[in-house]
A protein has these predicted regions:
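C-terminal output helix
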Residues: 128-137, 141, 149
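Acidic, metal-coordinating helix/loop segments flanking the phosphotransfer/catalytic sites
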Residues: 52-70
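CheY-like receiver
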Residues: 144-166
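Receiver (REC) domain active-site loop signature in two-component systems and cognate sites
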Residues: 77
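Charged docking surfaces used in two-component/phosphorelay signaling
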Residues: 38-42
Length: 166
């Protein structure tokens, strides 16, 4: 398949916002490398409805218009890099809850700390194992589902229920 052609139609081909029961969670993969986008899409398309963006600006557009369950983003990209995207996601109440994984070739401690300080849930270094990335996604999705269940049963939980663990 021609990745450029599939990327051009990605925004218009997405299903509507509501997800029917049993629908796959939608994974947003953001990377300026077309080969990496295709690799991640083919690696995760059995489990997720994978949509792609080539930079942070495209990713924000997808987030504004579609229900996204998790984000995997490269760090170094043009227009808006992964750290800037993560900060924008965490700063927007509409999607600040979405699990966010930075996937990058940058292995220095400064980059790792910057990635975690911007609000990323995981910082995964390239080269990486798709099994490890899948475990990270599964862990984040499970925790999110557990949190949603807890607050659906106790919608008016006291603020102490949200308190950080010491």
């Amino acid at each position: 398949a021609d990745i450029a052609a599939s990327h051009e139609t990605a925004l218009s081909d997405l299903p509507p916002m509501h997800k029917p029961e049993g629908a796959k969670p939608r994974l947003l993969v953001v990377d300026d490398n077309e080969d990496m986008l295709q690799f991640l899409k083919s690696s995760f398309e059995e489990t997720y409805d994978v949509v792609t963006a080539t930079n942070g600006m495209e990713a924000l557009s997808l987030l504004e218009n579609h229900q996204i369950s998790a984000i995997v983003s490269d760090l170094m990209m043009p227009k808006m890099n992964g750290v800037e995207l993560c900060r924008a996601v965490r700063g927007n109440q509409s999607f600040s809850h979405i699990p966010f994984i930075l996937l990058t070739a940058k292995t220095d401690n400064f980059s790792k700390i910057e990635g975690m300080n911007c609000g990323a849930d995981y910082y995964v270094e390239k080269p990486f194992s798709t099994h490890f990335l899948d475990a990270c996604l599964t862990n984040l999705m499970t925790r999110r589902k557990q949190l949603a269940q807890k607050f659906s049963q106790e919608p008016l939980a006291p603020p102490t229920a949200l308190a950080a663990t010491p």
